[in-house]
């Protein structure tokens, strides 16, 4: 069954922290990519001092290191539990907000950056407003858009901010300009071809009556404009659903799948897809359409884009945080055929505060789970998709380490004649079923010899924001290579 369903392995060691957030880091000083796990206070108000924190997993070596968490002005570790996260063009992970207070929750304004080269945290300029459960999206210029989340006073923030590495944070719609609609916490938002942002309708806890919509960012001092997008079924049952910009990104289709009608409510298996633009132009009035349903109703699940241009879904439960109704079986969606296939079952139950992401070798890791404050799932699972069992994988012998927008470049591979696709996949930075970072962008094949591909990168910065990407080649059997890292320079 491995050739159709893939296979799971539970590793013999565990994470030293609860991986509420996970981000794939570009290669460090030793040349190896690693995964950063973030716990902060780990959903435990009694956690103090050295127990706050993060861990860097060297998955090739099977080892962990523990970066020192910076201290706030009161001398306490900054608590990035339930922060927002997004990658900067230089590979650093920007982490904004977090937990100022428990019960009732209030957000932090602190902002940190994690450097994959030094494996160290640094403090950068704080936001204007605190944010707990915010959304962060990297823009075409490498700046980061942050919205929603609870402020220092516990109310939902409706004034987005943008972070520039050169000047810090600035409010997009400063008062007295009107705020945005009250976008839900951890809103699933994606950058589109034309620079607009799309809120899919996925959220945490409450959508506040806000439907899916397109957001057009202003030229200062203008204000954000919004265009509602209709057609989404079960709009009020998308709590901790999963959304993806379907591969390849230039097709501009967004899928939303699953979700619940409340934090402890019943999950849905419904799936919707919306076409937001064509190669020629934006769709003037995009509308969601019903797509084939998941086999299993899910919330708290993860959706991961694979280098064979499919989407792998794992984890979650048919009802809130119920382990008894947990879904262990995975599912794989193929956009080319518009069909779902059941995948292998994971041994470990993954519920609230679980996360999954793609590794450069094509495997998927699944970690975390925290259905109650006294329950922490530290085991690590690794999934091998079906392409691991379909024959020899193509090999990238060499490729550039940096490339500019619109540039042509060479990929050396002995399988050049058999290559079907060249893909760039942006590394994940995921939490709470929300991953605004991951996207797969097609790289056009211009010509080939028996040992090389001549390809051209898109000139559209919105389709592939600046930063580090995994470069995969995929053969005619839909079997991908191991990735090479490449940096798109601003």
Locate the predicted segments by residue.
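Kelch-like beta-propeller repeat domains
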Residues: 1-490
């Amino acid at each position: 069954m491995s050739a159709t369903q893939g296979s799971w392995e539970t590793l013999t060691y565990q994470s030293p922290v609860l991986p509420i957030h996970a981000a794939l880091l570009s290669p460090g000083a030793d040349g190896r990519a690693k995964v950063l796990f973030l716990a902060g206070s780990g959903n435990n108000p009694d956690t103090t001092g050295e127990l706050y924190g993060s861990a860097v997993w060297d998955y090739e070596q099977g080892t962990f290191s523990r970066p020192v968490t910076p201290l706030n002005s009161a001398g306490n570790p900054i608590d990035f539990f339930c922060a927002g996260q997004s990658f900067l063009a230089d590979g650093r992970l920007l982490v904004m907000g977090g937990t100022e207070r428990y019960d009732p929750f209030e957000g932090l304004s602190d902002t940190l950056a994690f450097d994959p080269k030094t494996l160290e945290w640094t403090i950068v300029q704080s936001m204007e407003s605190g944010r707990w459960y915010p959304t962060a999206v990297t823009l075409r210029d490498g700046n980061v858009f942050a919205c929603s989340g609870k402020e220092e006073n516990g109310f939902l923030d409706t004034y987005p901010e943008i972070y520039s590495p050169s000047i810090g944070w600035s409010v997009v719609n400063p008062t007295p300009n009107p705020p945005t609609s009250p976008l839900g916490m951890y809103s699933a938002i994606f950058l589109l071809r034309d620079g607009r942002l799309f809120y899919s309708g996925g959220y945490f806890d409450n959508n506040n009556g806000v439907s899916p919509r397109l957001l057009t960012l202003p030229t200062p001092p203008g204000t954000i404009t919004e265009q509602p997008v209709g057609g989404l079924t079960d709009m009020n049952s998308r709590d901790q659903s999963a959304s993806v910009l379907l591969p390849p990104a230039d097709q501009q289709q967004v899928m939303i799948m699953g979700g619940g009608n409340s934090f402890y409510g019943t999950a849905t298996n419904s799936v919707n897809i919306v076409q937001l633009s064509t190669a020629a132009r934006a769709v003037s009035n995009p509308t969601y359409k019903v797509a084939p349903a998941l086999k299993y109703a899910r919330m708290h699940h993860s959706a991961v884009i694979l280098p064979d241009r499919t989407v792998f879904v794992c984890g979650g439960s048919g009802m809130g945080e119920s382990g008894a109704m947990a879904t262990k079986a995975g599912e794989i969606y193929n956009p080319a055929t518009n069909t779902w296939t059941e995948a292998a079952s994971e041994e470990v139950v993954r519920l609230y505060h679980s996360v999954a992401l793609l590794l450069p070798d094509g495997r998927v890791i699944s970690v975390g789970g925290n259905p109650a404050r006294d329950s922490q799932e530290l085991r690590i699972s690794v999934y091998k998709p079906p392409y691991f069992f379909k024959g020899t994988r193509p090999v990238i012998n060499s490729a550039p380490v940096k490339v500019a927008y619109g540039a042509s470049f060479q990929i050396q591979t002995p399988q050049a004649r058999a290559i079907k696709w060249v893909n760039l996949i942006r590394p994940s930075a995921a939490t709470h079923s929300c991953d605004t970072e991951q996207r797969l962008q097609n790289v056009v094949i211009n010509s080939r010899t028996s040992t090389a591909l001549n390809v051209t990168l898109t000139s559209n910065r919105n389709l592939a924001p600046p930063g580090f990407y995994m470069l995969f080649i995929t053969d005619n059997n839909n079997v991908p290579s191991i990735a090479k890292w490449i940096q798109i320079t601003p």
